[in-house]
């Protein structure tokens, strides 16, 4: 993954500075009397960047910079509306200029689930965090409808599976698979595809893990805050659970993740979601997806 990021093209510095200047002018046009500072907040594995706006009265906002033609903020806006209407806590859109790729958003803070977990919270707090995360996921899944988001179809799944031979085997390891090895891999991929595509389908965040879940301050907050959902699709119901419990950034004992999975399955059945009636079948789907 990090090797892939390292190959992403870097925009020339003068273009980045020009974009930042345009953002500053845009903010001033909306609130000429409001003094503020603008500072980088984060970036992801794309041309998209984020800035935190701190106003002189102490309030903060976040600006998404999604420069056309490299980025399109409209998919993000569509998913924001879908997930927000479902009751999930997503950033509020305060202003938008889709032609230039600027969005002014509410600020969900700096505390990701990852940073909260790295502080080694008590077991009860960890259990609450993951309970909140699965509750939010169930809200999103209950709102699912076909034909609204792109389908997580065979072509997309296969394209992601092919990252393994292309990026890991060939680029990272510097190896070339023999014809016999490739045939074995292709057979394995077909088994995986059959299992994944046979699952019940729901809205899928696609990056539902500890770096994209925000821990919000204050009592009664609708945790977690959910970000980075622009690539959401309609696909296998176990996908986001695998992202959450088999997180690339946080490692858990299998006994722990199995307990969380059972709790999710019980809540999902009560919510009327199309999970398998038998937990063993559901767990098998989850493992095939993993």
Where are these regions (language model features)?
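ATP-binding glycine-rich phosphate-binding loop
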Residues: 36-51
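Active-site activation/catalytic loop segments of kinase-like enzymes and analogous catalytic loops
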Residues: 165-172, 237-275
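Active-site acidic catalytic loop and adjacent metal/ATP-binding pocket
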Residues: 47-54, 63, 140, 189-239, ...
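ATP-binding pocket architecture of kinase catalytic cores
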Residues: 51-157, 163, 169-173, 197-198
């Amino acid at each position: 993954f990090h090797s892939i990021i390292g190959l992403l093209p870097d925009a020339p510095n003068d273009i980045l500075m020009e974009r930042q200047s345009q953002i500053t002018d845009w903010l001033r046009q909306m609130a000429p009397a409001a003094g503020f500072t603008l500072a980088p907040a984060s970036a992801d594995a794309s041309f998209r960047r984020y800035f935190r706006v701190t106003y002189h009265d102490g309030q903060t906002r976040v600006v998404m910079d999604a420069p056309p033609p490299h980025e399109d903020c409209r998919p993000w806006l569509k998913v924001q509306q879908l997930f927000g209407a479902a009751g999930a806590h997503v950033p509020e859109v305060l202003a938008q200029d889709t032609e230039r790729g600027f969005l002014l958003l509410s600020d969900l803070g700096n505390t990701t689930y990852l940073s909260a977990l790295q502080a080694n919270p008590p077991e009860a707090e960890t259990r609450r965090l993951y309970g909140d995360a699965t509750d939010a996921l169930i809200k999103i899944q209950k709102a699912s409808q076909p034909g609204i988001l792109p389908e997580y179809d065979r072509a997309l799944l296969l394209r992601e599976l092919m990252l393994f031979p292309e990026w890991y085997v060939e680029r990272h390891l510097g190896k070339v698979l023999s014809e016999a090895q490739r045939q074995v891999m292709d057979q394995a991929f077909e088994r995986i595809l059959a299992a994944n595509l046979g699952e019940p389908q729901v809205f899928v965040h696609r990056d539902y893990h500890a770096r994209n879940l925000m821990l919000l301050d204050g009592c009664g907050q609708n945790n977690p805050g959910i970000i980075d959902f622009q690539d959401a699709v309609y696909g296998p119901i176990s996908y986001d659970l695998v992202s959450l419990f088999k997180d690339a950034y946080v490692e858990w004992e299998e006994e722990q993740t199995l307990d969380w999975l059972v709790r999710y399955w019980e809540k999902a059945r009560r919510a009327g979601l199309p999970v398998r009636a038998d937990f063993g079948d559901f767990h098998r789907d989850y493992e095939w997806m993993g």
